[in-house]
Amino acid sequence: MVKKNDVVSVVTTVGEFIGKYVESSESCITLNDPRMIVHDQTGMGFAKGLCMTGTEEPELGHFYNGQVVFMDKTNERVEKAYREFTSGIVL
């Protein structure tokens, strides 16, 4: 069971996102401090927001269920990297 502030991964039809779970409803999943997952030849990383041209460091992100494939608790290694990226504190 996912609890408030658990770090979760949301897979949508357009990409994968990570953030702290706030709530879900019939229409959407809401994350706090959400980030888009990005990939390049060196590996995986985090964008500063939800899209390449969007607001940096958004407070909330709403993912509408029509585009969500699934949500899962993020694995420990990626959660640690996300927390370091969003807080600036190396754990």
Task: List the predicted regions and their residue ranges.
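Conserved RNA-binding domains used in RNP assembly and mRNA/RNA metabolism
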Residues: 1-91
